[in-house]
Each structure stands twice: as C-alpha cells, then as structure tokens.
Amino acid sequence: MLRRTLFVGAAAMASVLAVAAAPASAQIKIGSAGPMTGEYASFGKQLQDGAQQAVADINAKGGVLGKKLVLEIGDDACDPKQAVSVANKFADDGVKFVAGHFCSSSSIPASKVYTEEGILQITPASTNPKFTDEGAWNTFRTCGRDDQQGEVAGHTIATEYKDRKVAILQDNTTYGKGIADETKKFMNAAGKKEAMYQAYVPGESDYTALVSRLKEAGINLVYFGGYHKEIGQIVKQAAQQGLKATYLGPDSLVTKEFWQISGPAGEGVMMTFPADPRNLPSAKAVVDEFKKKGIDPEGYVLYTYAAVQVWAEAATKANTTDPKKVAAELKSGGPWPTVLGNISYNKKGDVTKANYVWYIWHDGNYHQM
C-alpha cells in the first residue's frame, strides 16, 4: 500500500473554515493543495484564492446535494515527498476531492495516493502529460498540457524566428524539462534546430556564467522551461551583461512576481497561456467579486475556481459525491459550465479544448498579443 511505502512526514496543513460549525453529516470535505510556502508560494496563493472563493459561492447557493463544503488547504511546497504527506492527510480526513496540486512533480506522486485512497483529483496547473497519460480513473485537469503548449511555442519559433540562433534552457524539474522538451520536439519537427540546449540549477542567485555562455554562442533567442523566479533573474542579469535577445517562456510567467524580479529587463518577454479567462463573460461576476476583495484573479486563480466548480456540477448531476461515480460523470457528461466557459473531458481526463496564445510583458503587466 502506498500509505505504508511512501514517505509520510508532517506536512504543513491548514484547515480553512468554509462554513459555520455544522454536523459532520451535513458537510463535504474537499481539499486544495499547492506551494503555500517556499519560492513558488505566489502560485499557491492563486490556488488558495480560487478554491476559497468557489467554496464560498457554492455554499452561498446551498452547497452540493444540500451539504456545505468544508475546504482544507495543504502545503506541498512543490516537494514530491511533502505532496505525498499532504495527500495522505487528506485521505485520513475523509476528503472526497482535491483541486491541486500546482507543480507536476507534486501532482504526479500525490495522484498515486489519491488513486489508491479513492479521491478524485483535478489539477488547475500541472501540465506534464504524464499526469493523465498514466490512465488513472481519478486524474483530471482544467489546464492544458505541455505538448499542447509546446506545439504553439515550437511552431512559433520555427516559423517566425527561423533566422534566429536559439537556446533552450530548462531547470531539470518535471515541469521545466517537460515543457522545454515538448517545445524542442515541435520546433525540430518544423525544421528548426537549436544552437544550445542547456540545463540550469533552480534556486541559484547568480546566472552570470550561463549568460556569458549565451553571449559567446551568439544566442539571440532564448526559450525557457522553468519557473518565474529563475527566469526573471536570468533575464535581468542578461540585460546587465548586455545580451540582446528575444525571450520566450511558458505559463509559469503569468504572475506579477516575475516583473518584481526582472524589473524593466522583463519588457517584451513573451509566454504561452490560454486566452485570459478574466475577460470571459462567464467569469465576469466572479472576477468582480475578487476585485471587491482586492484580489486580481490572475494566472491559475480561475482555473482552480473552475476545478471546484466542475466537480460540484458533476457531483450534483450524478447525485452523489462518490469519487468514482463523479469521475465517470465528468467523462461521460458535460459540457460543464464554468468560469472558463464550457469544459468537456476526454477519456484521459484532459480538457478537449485548450487554446494557448501568446502574452507579452509590458510596463509591469502582461497582455494577450
């Protein structure tokens, strides 16, 4: 059993009171997990904000099947072992459904526990194909996949920047290497070869040696597979060293913390992300509610909201919170109305439509191109 063989340490776990005290029989426990602490905590906050607002809105309308939702927040710090601990804690607490995790390197090992313990999981952010390709009954996403995102990036580089000298940099994480390799695959298939493929160490503060190698190689376009903190530092240090290049990256750059790190050097950096859900008519009322609270529902906030929303819709239609029956309903039913618009699932648990587009950083904000 995974609960006996995998690491089960003390993981930071906060229980969020989503409803006034009520008998346990009148409650349904759900969870959301992500990096609430550590270098990716800004993304954990996005997941927490989305889940909390969804629970509040659902409870205000009577809950699910007449029962109020109680939300637990788990902190995995984007660490695989801690993610397993969080998953086991959710199982011990009787959680039926989890909106999470953020990092693919957390979602994938946690999913093994959820599969064994009979918990349905919908990630709003983990894009590595392996998460759903392994064929578990309980794994779903509201986001797209690296191969979908990499196809857009690879095709763009090969067709619109075919004369550039390209470097692909990646941080050797499940997410970063995954998206870099998918981009490389599609770029190569379109006839464009990279001049450099290089791994870098995440968590460092000095990337000047890496920048020097880029300059020496005459690189004038860099594609990053990794997270916003390191990418922001590399872009900033590249500007300080006088490297003139175009910078492209993945969906990890859709956080204002990127600009806080890069400063003006982030001007013109481009990244792939689905069409901004904040602008969708289906999200207007929820976006307005977030703004009243002083929250900008950027990045994965609405994707997490939608994860809770689509689970609640399927449970209501199935007339049960039994995870296997809800999972079957998600795949056979739909389309499901959410803040992201209508969502439908294929047999793997992937959304049938994930339209990635380009965004660009300008003057401290990112905009769809």
Tell where the protein language model's regions lie, with residue ranges.
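Extracytosolic ligand-binding ectodomains
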Residues: 1-9, 20, 25-369
